[in-house]
């Protein structure tokens, strides 16, 4: 047996069954039976021991589980002291507790289909035990104390490794049925074991020197009587009393089955009510999702209004500051000009006398220099003529030598260049062949590795999923709004406006909560897509070659939803209208109800609500656009989708140019204009991280690593989210 093992976690259905059975056992007027079978238990829960001890249960049914031991830690066998029937068959028990003899009133013990290798010696203390079933275990011998079971009627030791019976079994005079593997027995001999229970008992009594009496001469206590401890030697009416006992037990078990069936019906009714409640909860959850978008739009409008007020105030302050700076600049310029003029006048007066003196000195110095230069010039020309003649001869000789060296070097270089070019061509050809071989090898490896193909298919599936794309776009929009709110909050802190600061904080908290919810929805959608991938993998043929490559190609060649709807008969202008209003998720509803532009022009907002369009602003905008389209005699150029636009109709669309304030877009533009702000820690890089749960965007990726609290609000950081600025 392994020293360490992982406990199996029960399934949801098994957990519900356990809770239901425990509740039944604790109800007022419940019977003496505790049934926790088929609950996938790895150990008996503490609550079951407490229930048996407090409510004095007499029957404990724990079959068909994963038990490896009867007693878990911190539990005592004395809690089951009132148990008369203990059913433990179809488990994984390897041994029974050594103090099993403490269950003095136990009458039925069933441990069939387990892994028992031995029985405890204390089993002989179960003086009221009448049925012992150890079938299909790994027992090799029986303890001698088995002969002390004075009330034992039925003993089943078949499908074990037992070859010898203890002689003490002859003292069990009440044994009526003994089941064993007769051919595998050594003692008693196989022919004796095959003759039946009476023959085995006669053989053991003869070996022990006892007289054999049939079990019908001994009267056993009834199962439900608590006072009897030993057998009583009385020949008065044993058969009739035994039949009455059997009938009484049959009646009790039939009543138990009826009550069990009644409880099962009650359980089904409870599950039906639970399912109804879950449906109502799903409807409420859907309504909450619609309210989220409305809240987001309201927050955005309020933020826009606040930004306009702030920008107006900022413009006033900038104008005043600029006016003041102009005045200061003019004053400084006038003062500087006056000082400059004074300095210039003073300087001219000082230098007037110095200039005259310096001019005279310069004239004298120049005359001296000119006289010296004339003499040196005459001497220098003689030397230059001699040097020029010598240089001419030297250069003519050098030029001939250089020309000869150049010719020889040019010839050698030409030869080397030819040989090196040929060698380089060979190397290039070899490198190109190696690259081609590596490329072919990589392509064949990618085609053969199903794991890489599966990962590529999963990535493409997530990329093309409409719901996942809409959640990503909403998360991107909220990140942009949080970045703008953080910048706005930093600016307003410098102005010390507490009322506006509180309003921005409330908006930021609302956006951060909405961002957390969208992250959960994104993770849930990814799990759903992963589940779909697992189903595909389970249904796929294991020997099919390139299965994931084929699935990837199918998904890649799959037409967009808008193109499918157009091929099915939906008008292109209607598809383009819904895509322009960022309502492409309503395309299946319009296609299902076969709605055209003519029908749409005659519909009211209430009719659209019945179809499934819940946003009031979007209803009015769709109806208005449809009427405008029908009023135009021909199709406008902007409503004619090109081929590439049809293929990309379900990509995140840009927002329409003219939308009423009541229209709520379901997806942000394809390219968000992400504002930039500097990190409040290093003041150098841009802020790239969103802190949850506060929602501030104030740090770069490098500075946020050691932080545990937000630098702006000092809130605990539970999660960090990276913002990727779109170029």
UniProtKB/Swiss-Prot annotation:
Residues where Phosphoserine is found = 234, 604
Recorded GO CC terms: cytoplasm; cytosol; membrane
Q: Which Pfam families match?
A: LRR_8, SAM_2, zf-C3HC4_3
UniProt signal peptide: none
Q: Which residues form a coiled coil?
A: 241-382, 469-547
**Modified how:** Ubiquitination promoted by PHF23 leads to proteasomal degradation.
- Report the subcellular localization: Cytoplasm
UniProt motif (PTAP motif 2) ranges: 665-668
MF terms in GO? ubiquitin protein ligase activity; ubiquitin-protein transferase activity; zinc ion binding
User: Could you say which residue ranges form the zinc fingers (RING-type)?
Assistant: 679-714
Top enzyme class of this protein? transferase
Keywords, sorted A to Z: Autophagy, Coiled coil, Cytoplasm, Leucine-rich repeat, Metal-binding, Phosphoprotein, Protein transport, Repeat, Transferase, Transport, Ubl conjugation, Ubl conjugation pathway, Zinc, Zinc-finger
Q: In which tissues is it expressed?
A: Widely expressed.
Show the SMART domains listed in the entry: LRR_BAC, LRR_TYP
Pinpoint motif PTAP motif 1 by residue range: 653-656
What information about domains appears in the record's comments? The coiled coil domains interact with the SB domain of TSG101. The PTAP motifs mediate the binding to UEV domains.
The entry describes its oligomerization and partners as: Interacts with TSG101. Interacts with PHF23. Interacts with FUS.
Task of the protein? E3 ubiquitin-protein ligase that mediates monoubiquitination of TSG101 at multiple sites, leading to inactivate the ability of TSG101 to sort endocytic (EGF receptors) and exocytic (viral proteins) cargos. Bacterial recognition protein that defends the cytoplasm from invasive pathogens. Localizes to several intracellular bacterial pathogens and generates the bacteria-associated ubiquitin signal leading to autophagy-mediated intracellular bacteria degradation (xenophagy).
Can you say what this protein is called?
E3 ubiquitin-protein ligase LRSAM1
Q: Per the UniProt entry, what species is this protein from, by scientific name?
A: Mus musculus
What gene name does this entry carry? Lrsam1
